[in-house]
Design a protein with these regions (language model features):
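An alpha-beta-alpha
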Residues: 67, 85, 170-217, 315, ...
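Hydrophobic alpha-helical segments within soluble ligand-binding/sensing domains
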Residues: 61-62, 153-194, 294-314
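Pocket-lining segment of extracytoplasmic ligand-binding domains
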Residues: 204-273, 279
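Bacterial lipoprotein signal-peptidase II cleavage site
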Residues: 18-30
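Beta-alpha junction/loop-to-helix N-cap segments that form part of ligand/metal-binding clefts
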Residues: 102-160, 254-269, 273, 277-278
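Extracytoplasmic "Venus flytrap"
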Residues: 62-86, 92, 99-108, 202-206, ...
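Flexible loop/turn connectors
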Residues: 280-333
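Structural motif
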Residues: 97-119, 227-242
Length: 350
């Protein structure tokens, strides 16, 4: 009996020891397994994140953007802005297709083209000149729109403010240094007493510049008289009326006048009336001189904005309207016109 009890006691003690060892083994295994599991989960998460980032980068690199362009009319300044935009996109190295549309100065065509570009589902639309910008901005609040060759987007009702656009429209302004242009006028033509301001009354950008010009002309001690047109058919008759009343004509960056500048120059130069212009393209078409911006560079500036917006690095709402500085403006003179008028521009040559 005693032997039996002793054997049972030994057996129980052995089982207790084995149970204790088993518990310790499980604890060690648990302690060893838990960190390993956490590390595996972390590694898996890092791998998934890396794959996601690589996929996103690949998608961005391979994406082909769809861009629509609406240009109001063909003339040197707007053509240069358009080319600068395209060259800027090419320099950025992005893949894109572009649908180029020109309204040929027709507001009805502007509206039709604007609707087409919106309905085509473009990733971004470039609008060149104020009427074109207003047309497309009225068709969508979703597609990013960049404008260029627009003098004052805020006054034109395109943005909440030029500093903080606040919507789907931003871009660049072609506000020229009107003050410096009037100063150039008085320097080249010190005997002038009356300045004729020639522009299209339907263009907000021209009205804005004309108001600045009036103040600067008055500050220079000169008189001014307005000569406005509402269609290209009126240009010749209006200029013919102006040349008998003024000593010089000032034409701001007005799209209708720019497109009809050869007619303006023909009438003015025949009557020995100099034309100081808002931009270099108008000078090339027969105007006397200007101190203005480079529209090609303005287009490239707009392209830089476009690339950031397309890549998701910026939004139109938070992209301020861009401007070229006065230091980036240059003198442009037409030697042939100067010779016709008997004016020496050699002092302004580079």
């Amino acid at each position: 009996m005693k032997k039996l009890l002793a054997m049972m006691l030994v057996t129980c003690m052995s089982l207790s020891v084995l149970a204790g060892c088993g518990a310790k083994t499980e604890e060690v295994a648990a302690e060893t397994t838990e960190p390993a599991t956490e590390e595996a989960v972390a590694d898996e998460a890092e791998t998934e994140e890396a794959v996601t980032e690589e996929t996103a980068a690949a998608d961005t690199a391979e994406k082909e953007y769809k861009i629509g362009v609406i240009q109001l009319v063909e003339h040197a300044a707007l053509d240069a802005a358009n080319q600068g935009f395209i060259d800027g996109l090419n320099e950025a190295g992005i893949k894109y297709t572009v649908d180029q549309q020109n309204a040929q100065g027709d507001q009805t065509a502007c509206d039709t083209i604007a609707s087409k570009l919106v309905n085509d589902g473009n990733d971004l639309i470039l609008a060149i000149a104020t009427p074109a910008a207003q047309a497309v901005a009225g068709k969508t609040t979703d597609i990013p729109i960049l404008v260029t060759a627009v003098t004052d987007p805020e006054t034109s009702g395109l943005v909440t403010s030029n500093e903080a656009p606040g919507g789907n429209v931003s871009g660049t302004s072609d506000l020229t240094p009107v003050k410096e242009q009037i100063a150039l006028l008085t320097e080249i033509l010190p005997e002038a007493k009356t300045v004729g301001i020639l522009y299209c009354s339907a263009e907000d950008n021209s009205i804005f510049q004309a108001d600045i010009a009036k103040a600067e002309i008055e500050a220079a001690g000169l008189a001014w008289e307005e000569f406005t047109v509402s269609s290209s058919n009126e240009i010749q008759s209006v200029v013919e009326s102006a040349v008998s009343k003024v000593d010089v004509i000032y034409a701001p960056t007005d799209n209708m006048i720019a497109a009809g500048m050869t007619t303006v120059a023909m009438v003015a130069n025949e009557n020995k009336i100099p034309v100081i212009c808002g931009e270099a393209g108008m000078v090339e078409a027969g105007g006397l001189a200007t101190y203005g911006i480079d529209y090609y560079n303005l287009g490239k500036m707009t392209a830089q904005q476009a690339v950031k917006i397309l890549k998701g690095e910026a939004t139109t709402a938070e992209t301020p309207i861009g401007y070229l500085t006065a230091e980036q403006c240059e003198f442009a003179g037409n030697d042939e016109t100067a010779a016709t008028l008997g004016i020496d521009l050699s002092a302004y040559a580079k």
